[in-house]
C-alpha cells in the first residue's frame, strides 16, 4: 500500500490521491490478490464426512472433499490452483478463464498439461454450492459440494451409468414432421380443364377410375432427387405404382396435390398434365391405363423451384383411398464460400460482411442465448443450487465446444421455475413445452421474446431407472444446414434431466436442436447433413452424440465428431465424402449463425471498444469493457453511493496472435491525473506510460481466442461520498500484449465511470 500511496502523492491532487488510495485498497481485495501456496490445496480430499449423503448420481470412487470458499472466489485468470484429488500430493493447475452469469453464479476453468499427463477442471459455484467436472487422462469425475462455514464440503465421485436393458436404447430425439395437408373434396365429376388456354381439351374417351383402390391392393412410392434441393434448382420424382392384388384394374389415374404450388412443371411422363381440380387447386393429373395383376409401372415428373417454394414442396399422391405423402426441403446453399475466407456466402450475408472480399470476415464465436426453465422436481434435486447446477451443465457444453473447435458460446439469459405436471414423463413434458399443452408453459413465448431466447431448455429430475437423460427435436433435418423455415425456431426446445450422471447432456441435447443425430450405426443417416452425426469405434470410444452401448464401450469422450481430431489414437470422425461420414464440428460451425439469429439479443453483451495496435498493424481483435450495477442485465457508465458494481472485460484475440505467448493488462486512473496498473497479484503499481513499463495483470501464457476477466466483483462505494469526489471520472483501459513481438493491442477509448451523487 505504501508504494501505491507514494505514486499517488507524486502525480495527483489531494482529492484524487484520496480516491485512488481507496481504489488501491479495493484492488488489493480483488481475486488473485493473495498469494496461493502450492502446499496448501484449495480443493482437497477430506477425512471429515460432509453433512450430506453422496448424490444419487454417484457411482464408484466416492471420496469426501473440501474447498476453501474465500480462496476459490479470489482466483483470477493466470493464477495457480492447487488441488489434491488423489494421494497425498497436490497438482498445480493454472486458471485459464473465469465467467460470470446473470444469476450471480461464477465459473472457472483450470488445466494442467505435463507430458502425456493432463488435468482439466471446470467449476461452477455460488455462495452456497459448487459443482465440478474433472478429467484426468481417461478418468472422468464430478464434484458436488455445499457450503458449511468457510468451506464447501461434499463429494468427488465417478458418476454411475444409466439403466440399460437388453442393449436397447430409447431414442432421445424426434424429427418434426410437415403438417399433413388435406386436399379439398371434389363434389362433382372432373372436367378436363387445361391450365393453358391455347391447349385443346382432353380428347373424349373412357374416364379414368380409381374406385376400389386402397393400400390393400396397391403400393405407391415416390423417390425424389436431389433431396434437399437448392431454391432455383429442379428436382425429379420417380413414382412406382404396383398392383399387389390378383385382380386387374382398368383406366386408373393418380393425382398429385400441393406439388404445383409455388413450383413450375418442367417435365412429366406421357399421360401426365397440369390441370385444375374442381376446387380450382392446381394438381398434376396422370392417366395410368390398365394394370394387370402384379404389374408395376413407373412414371416421373420434374419441377423447378424458387425461393417462394421454401421451406418445402409437398407432393401428396392420391389414388382412390390410397394416399402417400412425400416432401422435399427447399433450401439455400449454406456452404458456398466464394472468397475462400472460411465463412460461407450464406453466413456472410447473415453477418453483414462481403462474401466477395476475403478481408471482410467475422470469425467471432456465435453467442447463442439460452433460457433455462426448471421444475419443482429439479429444484428438489438441487435445493441449494439448482441454477448453479444448470450453469455447470452449460459450462461443460461450452468447454466441449472450445475443445472441439466449435465457435459457439451458450449464454444463459433467463432462469425460472415452471409448475409442470410432476407425473408427466419427459416425452409429454417436451410436447407440452413445444405446443403449450400445459398452462404451466403459457408464459414461455412471452418470456422468450422478452429475453431473446434462441434455444429453450426445460430441466427436470431424472425418472427412476431412466435409460435416457433428455429429449429434443432435430433441427433442420435433411436440409443441408438450412434452418430458414419459420418452424425451426418453434421446435428449438429440449428436455434435460438436471441430475443426469452424464454431465455433457446439454451439449448432447442441444446438438440435436442444431441438426445432429447419434451415429450412422444407430440411426442409419445423419441429421441436417449426412455427416451431421456422432462417431465411435467399437470397444474404444464414442463422441458426444453417440451412445456408448452401441459401440460396446464405456468411454464417452467430451468432443464432437471430426475427422480432424484425434481420439485415443483414432480419428474422431469420418470425412464427408464417405457414406458413413461423421463431422459434427463442421456441421455446428456451418449452422451456428442461424441458431444465434433465432431471436434478437435482449440481454446485453459487453460493449465493444475500438482497438489499435502500438505497431500500427491492422488487427482483428475486440475488447469489451463494461460496468454493471444489476448483475449483468444492463451496463452503466455511472456509479453512486451504495451500489454494487461489477467491472467485466471480454478480450477476443486476433487470429494471428492466438497460440502465442502473451498477457492481459489493465490500466486505471483518474482522468487527467496519471495512471496506475494492475499487476498479477491484484495490486496497483505505477505505470510510466511506456510499453516497456507495462506489467501483466495475468500470468504470461498462451493467448486463447477469448479471454474473459472479472476485473472488479461486487465493489460497493460508501454510502457517503465526499463532495469533492462527485463528478470525478475513473478511466479503465484493457489491453493484451504479444510477448514475441512486444506489440500491444489496446482499447482506443477508455471505459469512463462517473461518480454520481445518487444511483441512476
Residue ranges and their predicted role:
Residues 35-217:
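N-terminal prosegments of processed precursors
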Residues 237-239, 302-328, 726-736:
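Serine/threonine-enriched low-complexity regions used as flexible
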Residues 203, 208-211, 360-604:
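Extracellular (secreted or membrane-anchored) zinc-dependent metallopeptidases
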Residues 250-285, 289-290, 673-695:
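A surface/secretory-pathway sequence property marking extracellular, secreted
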Amino acid at each position: 500500500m505504501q508504494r501505491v500511496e507514494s505514486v499517488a502523492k507524486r502525480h495527483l491532487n489531494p482529492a484524487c490521491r484520496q480516491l485512488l488510495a481507496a481504489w488501491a485498497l479495493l484492488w488489493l481485495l480483488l481475486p488473485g490478490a493473495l498469494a496461493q501456496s502450492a502446499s496448501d490445496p484449495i480443493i482437497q480430499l477430506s477425512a471429515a464426512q460432509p453433512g450430506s449423503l453422496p448424490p444419487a448420481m454417484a457411482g464408484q470412487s466416492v471420496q469426501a472433499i473440501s474447498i476453501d470458499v474465500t480462496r476459490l472466489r479470489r482466483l483470477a485468470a493466470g493464477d495457480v490452483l492447487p488441488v489434491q484429488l488423489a494421494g497425498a500430493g497436490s497438482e498445480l493447475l493454472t486458471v485459464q478463464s473465469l465467467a460470470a452469469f446473470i444469476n450471480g453464479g461464477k465459473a472457472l476453468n483450470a488445466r494442467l498439461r505435463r507430458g502425456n499427463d493432463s488435468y482439466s477442471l471446470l467449476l461452477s459455484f455460488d455462495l452456497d454450492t459448487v459443482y465440478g467436472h474433472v478429467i484426468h487422462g481417461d478418468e472422468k469425475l464430478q464434484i458436488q459440494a455445499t457450503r458449511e462455514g468457510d468451506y464447501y464440503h461434499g463429494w468427488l465421485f465417478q458418476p454411475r451409468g444409466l439403466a440399460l436393458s437388453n442393449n436397447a436404447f430409447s431414442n432421445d430425439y424426434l424429427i418434426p414432421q410437415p403438417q399433413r395437408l388435406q386436399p379439398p373434396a371434389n363434389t362433382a365429376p372432373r372436367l378436363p380443364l387445361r391450365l393453358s388456354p391455347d391447349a385443346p381439351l382432353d380428347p373424349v374417351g373412357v374416364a379414368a377410375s380409381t374406385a376400389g383402390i386402397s393400400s390393400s391392393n396397391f403400393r405407391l412410392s415416390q423417390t425424389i432427387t436431389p433431396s434437399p434441393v437448392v431454391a432455383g434448382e429442379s428436382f425429379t420424382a420417380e413414382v412406382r405404382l404396383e398392383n399387389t392384388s390378383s385382380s386387374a384394374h382398368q383406366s386408373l389415374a393418380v393425382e398429385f396435390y400441393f406439388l404445383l404450388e409455388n413450383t413450375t412443371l418442367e417435365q412429366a411422363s406421357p399421360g401426365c398434365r397440369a390441370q385444375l381440380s374442381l376446387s380450382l387447386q392446381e394438381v398434376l393429373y396422370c392417366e395410368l391405363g390398365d394394370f394387370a395383376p402384379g404389374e408395376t409401372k413407373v412414371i416421373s415428373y420434374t419441377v423447378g423451384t424458387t425461393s417462394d417454394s421454401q421451406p418445402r414442396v409437398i407432393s401428396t399422391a392420391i389414388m382412390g383411398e390410397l394416399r402417400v405423402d412425400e416432401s422435399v426441403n427447399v433450401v439455400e446453399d449454406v456452404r458456398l464460400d466464394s472468397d475462400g475466407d472460411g465463412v460461407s456466402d450464406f453466413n456472410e450475408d447473415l453477418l453483414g460482411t462481403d462474401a466477395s472480399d476475403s478481408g471482410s470476415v467475422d470469425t467471432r464465436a456465435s453467442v447463442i442465448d439460452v433460457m433455462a426453465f426448471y421444475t419443482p422436481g429439479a429444484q428438489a434435486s438441487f435445493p441449494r443450487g439448482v441454477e448453479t447446477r444448470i450453469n455447470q451443465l452449460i459450462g461443460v457444453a461450452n468447454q466441449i465446444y472450445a475443445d472441439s473447435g466449435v465457435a459457439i458460446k451458450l449464454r444463459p439469459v433467463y432462469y425460472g421455475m415452471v409448475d409442470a405436471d410432476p407425473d408427466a414423463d419427459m416425452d409429454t413434458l417436451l410436447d407440452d413445452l413445444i405446443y403449450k399443452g400445459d398452462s404451466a408453459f403459457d408464459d414461455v413465448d412471452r418470456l422468450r421474446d422478452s429475453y431473446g431466447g434462441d434455444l429453450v431448455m426445460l430441466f427436470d429430475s431424472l425418472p427412476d431407472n431412466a435409460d435416457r437423460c433428455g429429449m429434443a427435436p432435430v433441427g433442420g433435418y435433411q436440409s443441408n444446414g438450412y434452418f430458414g423455415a419459420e418452424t425451426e425456431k418453434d421446435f428449438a426446445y429440449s428436455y434435460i434431466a438436471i441430475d443426469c450422471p452424464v454431465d455433457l447432456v446439454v451439449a448432447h441435447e442441444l446438438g440435436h436442436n442444431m441438426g445432429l443425430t447419434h451415429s450412422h450405426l444407430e440411426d442409419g443417416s445423419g441429421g441436417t447433413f449426412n455427416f451431421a452425426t456422432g462417431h465411435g469405434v467399437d470397444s474404444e470410444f464414442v463422441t458426444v452424440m453417440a451412445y456408448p452401448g452401441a459401440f460396446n464401450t464405456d468411454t464417452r469422450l467430451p468432443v464432437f465428431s471430426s475427422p480432424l481430431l484425434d481420439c485415443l489414437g483414432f480419428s474422431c470422425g469420418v470425412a464427408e465424402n464417405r457414406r458413413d461420414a461423421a463431422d459434427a464440428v463442421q456441421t455446428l460451425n456451418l449452422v451456428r449463425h442461424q441458431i444465434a439469429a433465432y431471436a434478437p439479443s435482449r440481454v446485453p453483451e459487453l460493449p465493444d471498444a475500438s482497438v489499435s495496435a502500438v505497431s500500427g498493424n491492422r488487427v482483428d481483435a475486440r475488447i469489451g469493457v463494461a460496468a454493471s450495477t444489476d448483475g449483468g442485465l444492463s451496463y452503466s457508465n455511472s456509479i453512486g453511493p451504495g451500489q454494487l458494481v461489477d467491472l467485466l472485460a471480454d478480450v477476443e484475440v486476433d487470429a494471428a496472435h492466438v497460440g502465442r505467448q502473451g498477457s492481459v493488462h489493465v490500466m486505471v486512473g483518474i482522468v487527467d491525473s496519471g495512471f496506475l496498473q494492475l499487476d498479477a497479484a491484484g495490486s496497483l503499481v505505477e505505470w510510466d506510460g511506456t510499453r516497456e513499463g507495462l506489467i501483466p495483470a495475468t500470468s504470461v501464457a498462451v493467448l486463447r481466442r477469448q479471454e474473459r476477466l472479472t476485473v472488479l466483483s461486487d465493489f460497493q462505494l460508501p454510502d457517503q461520498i465526499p463532495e469533492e469526489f462527485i463528478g470525478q471520472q475513473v478511466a479503465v483501459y484493457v489491453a493484451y500484449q504479444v510477448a514475441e513481438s512486444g506489440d500491444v493491442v489496446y482499447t482506443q477509448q477508455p471505459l469512463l465511470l462517473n461518480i454520481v451523487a445518487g444511483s441512476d
